A protein has these predicted regions:
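Residue-level recognition of beta-strand->loop/alpha-helix junctions
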Residues: 63-67, 90, 130
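N-terminal "domain-start" segment that seeds a small globular fold
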Residues: 1-21, 87-92
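Short active-site neighborhood of thiol/selenol oxidoreductases, capturing the structured segment around
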Residues: 21-42
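Structural microenvironment flanking redox-active thiols in thiol-disulfide oxidoreductases
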Residues: 42-83, 96-101
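Loop/turn elements at helix/coil->beta-strand transitions in domains of secreted/extracellular proteins
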Residues: 25-30, 57-62, 84-86, 113, ...
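Solvent-exposed loop/turn segments at secondary-structure junctions
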Residues: 35-39, 67-71, 94-96, 124-125, ...
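Thiol-/selenol-based redox modules, centered on thioredoxin-like
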Residues: 112-152
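Short, internal strand/loop/helix patches
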Residues: 79-113
Length: 152
């Protein structure tokens, strides 16, 4: 029975509600947090995200733009040929000072971008790259691991 004295959970943002519904579906789901002003985010896009998406047609991909004044950064995604099949979401809010970039998403800490979370076919977080760029090989391995029969 829930504790009646516990504080009520914070309401989910539209982006969180959409991601929660996405990862609850059967399959492997990749959720990528980024911002177009972030050099590490754009370096990671240039490093091969288009190819990773192309190699994994059975996985879903969601790019969540954070700390960017509510803008998606669509022109940056287009510059790096991120395909339309990648879902684009935005968490509203301005870019906070570097020391204050701490938030949660689905109750999990999000303190750095880029960050990439890979959910397995059971909707459970299987791999999290939380502090910077992930290589295409690391992403491929994480997606393969999330798709495997091993119960993460």
């Amino acid at each position: 029975m829930p504790d009646p004295t516990a504080p009520a959970p914070a309401a989910l943002s539209d982006a969180e509600a959409t991601v929660r519904a996405t990862v609850a579906r059967d399959g492997v789901h990749v959720v990528h947090f980024w911002a177009p002003w972030c050099d590490n985010s754009t370096a990671e896009l240039a490093g091969g995200w288009y190819e990773v998406v192309a190699r994994h047609p059975d996985a879903s991909f969601t790019f969540v733009t954070v700390w960017n004044d509510g803008e998606t950064g669509e022109s940056t995604l287009a510059r790096y040929a991120i395909p339309e099949r990648v879902q684009r979401l935005v968490v509203p809010g301005v870019q906070p000072p570097k020391g204050e970039r701490r938030t949660t998403f689905l109750g999990l800490p999000l303190t750095w971008i880029p960050a990439t979370w890979v959910f397995n076919r059971n909707g459970q977080l299987a791999t999290a790259f939380n502090y910077g760029e992930a290589t295409p090989a690391q992403l491929d391995d994480a997606i393969a691991g999330a798709a495997s029969a091993w119960p993460h």
